[in-house]
Amino acid sequence: MSHNSFGHLFRVTTWGESHGLALGCVVDGCPPGITFTEAEIQAYLDKRKPGQSKYTTQRREPDQVRVLSGVLLGDDGVTMTTTGTPISMMIENTDQRSKDYGEIARQYRPGHADYTYDVKYGIRDYRGGGRSSARETAARVAAGAIARKVVPGLEVKGALVAMGVHGIDRRRWNWSEVDNNPFFSPDAGSVELFADYLDGIRKSGSSVGAVIEIIAEGVPAGIGAPIYGKLDQDIASLLMSINAVKGVEIGNGFEAARLTGEENADEMRIGNDGKPLFLSNHAGGILGGIATGAPVVARFAVKPTSSILTPRRSIDKDGKEVDVMTKGRHDPCVGIRAVPIGEAMVACAIADHYLRHRGQTGRV
């Protein structure tokens, strides 16, 4: 199985399976001299880890990260400094229940990658989905924590803006609310609505999708490249690589198709600081594949979790028709925990383009 790496200069390789002993990543190309602590990485992993509320899977994983290489430990015993060599990080799996998946060892769960993995490789790890499980994304979040350190002044934030048929009221958007509720919603008024809605979904044994919005501020103007090396192209690619993601848009995205040229174009003036100022940001901070200096805005759609308690028609490996009902512990809305994952992937894309731009032009 190939295609376990992404990035050019800031290159990330992830490894491990849902029910293996551990999973992790190797970050290659991180510049030397960057300082961080394991606690800083852990803070992002804690946002993604399971079992934190009744609205996520009850699999209990501490997701404790260990940095194995690529750093020098400071005299304080806490601060690490990158050496420029590959940074390897590991997260142990501690709460696997492989027996929950015994009945589907030869059955294909509708909506999952069971059939496609089998038809491609002739073998699949049925225990929690193996490599195709969202468990793999913990390693991406760890890599994203390093990526944030590469670009000075970069701030990447995410929020859940829609769940099923319900969306937030953007007039009430408040970033300080995101970490105050189990849905990462920036709208305090939507929390009770989401809770009641998801309670009903969860109790029925079903699932629901979500839309996540990521905003990156402090992105240097000029990073990115035209034609086949676009910043938005790579952001879209990395967001699409996240489990269950079925759509991505940058800036206005599909809404731009409903606007006129006058409505969609971002007009410019010179700001009070003497620098170019965009009067709007319909482009989502990227034009021609190159960052404008305005906030980079991306949204992605996460489909409903395919592991549900309702029997679904399918087939097994022997070609027999079967009814499949998934057991085990699963997220009724996997989009909730996709927020820190989306942040990590956007951070990695920006860090990679930042280093590529610096290498090509000698400036940032």
From Swiss-Prot:
Alphabetized GO MF terms: chorismate synthase activity; FMN binding
Pfam families documented for this protein: Chorismate_synt (PF01264)
One BP term from GO: amino acid biosynthetic process
Cofactor note: Reduced FMN (FMNH(2)).
UniProt binding sites for NADP(+): R48
Catalysed transformations (reactions): 5-O-(1-carboxyvinyl)-3-phosphoshikimate = chorismate + phosphate
Positions annotated to bind FMN: R131, S132, S133, N243, A244, G288, K303, P304, T305, S306, S307, R329
One GO CC term on file: cytosol
Keywords: Amino-acid biosynthesis, Aromatic amino acid biosynthesis, FAD, Flavoprotein, FMN, Lyase, NADP
InterPro entries in UniProt: Chorismate_synth, Chorismate_synth_AroC_sf, Chorismate_synthase_CS
EC number(s) per entry: 4.2.3.5
Sequence similarity: Belongs to the chorismate synthase family.
Its biological purpose: This reaction introduces a second double bond into the aromatic ring system.
Subunit structure, interactors included: Homotetramer.
Record NCBIfam families: aroC, PRK05382.1
Protein name, as recorded: Chorismate synthase
Species the sequence originates in: Brucella anthropi (strain ATCC 49188 / DSM 6882 / CCUG 24695 / JCM 21032 / LMG 3331 / NBRC 15819 / NCTC 12168 / Alc 37)
